Swiss-Prot record:
Subcellular location: Host cell membrane; Virion; Secreted; Host Golgi apparatus membrane
GO cellular component assignments: extracellular region; host cell Golgi membrane; host cell plasma membrane; membrane; virion component
Membrane topology: Lipid-anchor
Region (Acidic) residue spans: 62-65
UniProt PTM comment: The virion-associated Nef proteins are cleaved by the viral protease to release the soluble C-terminal core protein. Nef is probably cleaved concomitantly with viral structural proteins on maturation of virus particles.
Mutagenesis or variant effect for W57R: In Nef*4; complete loss of Nef-induced CD4 down-regulation
Domain of life, source organism: Viruses
Gene: nef
Residues that span the membrane, as ranges: none
The name this protein goes by in its record: Protein Nef
GO molecular function: GTP binding; SH3 domain binding
Phosphoserine, modified sites: S6
The family this protein is said to belong to: Belongs to the lentivirus primate group Nef protein family.
Amino acid sequence: MGGKWSKSSVVGWPAVRERMRRAEPAADGVGAVSRDLEKHGAITSSNTAATNADCAWLEAQEEEEVGFPVTPQVPLRPMTYKAAVDLSHFLKEKGGLEGLIHSQRRQDILDLWIYHTQGYFPDWQNYTPEPGVRYPLTFGWCYKLVPVEPDKVEEANKGENTRLLHPVSLHGMDDPEREVLEWRFDSRLAFHHVARELHPEY
């Protein structure tokens, strides 16, 4: 009656199949690579460093050896709604991002840390493009980017102790709108996908 692989009683297979069936879907708003991970369980040939900016960025980070000297400690997976909410609250409890001035370099460091420790591909932390408050495209991520008042930026840059390369001193050079932004926790973003309402095209 068939080979040993034709039987459903292969040790452990029913548990693996059930685990695959119960895998959480990727959160709304994640990138193409995370969609591949959700659908196929791996990065497909349609997403390479040549065709996908997130893959190219990650490859460059690994080649430069900046950031973290370790390889991912867990399997690669897409960011899910539950994981985004949990990560947001974890960072809030640890006091990690609240009020921290945003820069692309700081976002890259956060993405690399999460990639290496949690296995989430770094294409999930994207924000709406307009000036003003930037809302996360990934549903469940509870940090939005809020412009810092110009007088606070000027106050931070007064005196002799100003650090020229600190993100607040760069006056928004990383930002297309030239705004100085800070991460701000907003628990309502776990229940209300503002980015989807403002930009249904994403």
